[in-house]
Amino acid sequence: MNKPFDKLKLHGFNNLTKSLSFSIYDICYAKTEQQRKEYIEYIDEQYSADRLTDILGEVVDIIGANILNVARQDYEPQGASVTILVSEEPVEEQQNYDADEAPGPLPDSVVAHLDKSHICVHTYPEAHPDDGICTFRADIEVSTCGIISPLKALNFLIHSLESDVVTIDYRVRGFTRDINGVKHYIDHAISSIQNFMTEDTKEAYQMMDVNVYQENLFHTKMMLKETDLNTYLFGLSTDDLSDEEEEEIRSKLTREMQEIFYGRNLPDLD
């Protein structure tokens, strides 16, 4: 972990823009066409615009901001999107700002304060036409202009959504000046996005970093280590499957997760 930054005395407003973008994937197996249809309907209801608004509202609470406007929409045949504009906090409340490179809070605590932000989410349910694999993706972006890193909301979002594979990008852009006129291109310590995650999260996932430190650009990929096949089955359980079927389904799920994690199609081994 890097040494924490000393607090900067700024000339005017903090003009740094910090953006957290990540895609969360939930993967399952549905054996029949009817089960795949029911999975899409389940996901569409589970992650409706109303529920996503509630989740993002919790994010706003975590970062200590105020909602200015909410735009939300459910789509046909499936999918939803929500965008929230957030107001800045009074200057006197910013004195409790925590810049440490450490995990952010879960939804039962509020520890950070925000200057300006927008938060948005889009969902993409889909199913393979004939091999039973179904994948739900949620794209989320939290962008702030000010002193607070949106990484403080990361833990809550990972725990709020069913996350089998996660890809995360964090970047800091622009600069802010101190009282001597010196430009600063980042105002907090960070060596890895992983340092903003709790230990239970790090233990549950296989992770890989690709960071470009000189560009203030950080990237982390996560893949769940879960081995219980029942957690990936929709509308059936392992009791309904033969040993051969279990092995085949497990192979399909593993392949799907690895292809998403590595961002490329794997060659057939047959």
Curated annotation (Swiss-Prot):
It is an enzyme of class 4 (lyase). One of its GO terms (molecular function) is adenosylmethionine decarboxylase activity. Keywords: Autocatalytic cleavage, Decarboxylase, Lyase, Polyamine biosynthesis, Pyruvate, S-adenosyl-L-methionine, Schiff base, Spermidine biosynthesis, Zymogen. The modification Pyruvic acid (Ser) is found at residue 117. InterPro entries: AdoMetDC_fam_prok, S-AdoMet_deCO2ase_bac, S-AdoMet_deCO2ase_core. The record marks 116-117 as: Cleavage (non-hydrolytic). GO terms for biological process: spermidine biosynthetic process. The keyword NAD does not apply. Pfam families: AdoMet_dc (PF02675). The active site is at 117 (schiff-base intermediate with substrate), 122 (proton acceptor), 145 (proton donor). Its EC number is 4.1.1.50. Binds 1 pyruvoyl group covalently per subunit. Pathway: Amine and polyamine biosynthesis; S-adenosylmethioninamine biosynthesis; S-adenosylmethioninamine from S-adenosyl-L-methionine: step 1/1. It catalyses: S-adenosyl-L-methionine + H(+) = S-adenosyl 3-(methylsulfanyl)propylamine + CO2. Its cofactor is pyruvate. Is synthesized initially as an inactive proenzyme. Formation of the active enzyme involves a self-maturation process in which the active site pyruvoyl group is generated from an internal serine residue via an autocatalytic post-translational modification. Two non-identical subunits are generated from the proenzyme in this reaction, and the pyruvate is formed at the N-terminus of the alpha chain, which is derived from the carboxyl end of the proenzyme. One of its GO terms (cellular component) is cytosol. Belongs to the prokaryotic AdoMetDC family. Type 2 subfamily. Catalyzes the decarboxylation of S-adenosylmethionine to S-adenosylmethioninamine (dcAdoMet), the propylamine donor required for the synthesis of the polyamines spermine and spermidine from the diamine putrescine. Heterooctamer of four alpha and four beta chains arranged as a tetramer of alpha/beta heterodimers. PANTHER family: S-ADENOSYLMETHIONINE DECARBOXYLASE PROENZYME (PTHR33866:SF1). This is S-adenosylmethionine decarboxylase proenzyme. It comes from Pseudoalteromonas translucida (strain TAC 125).
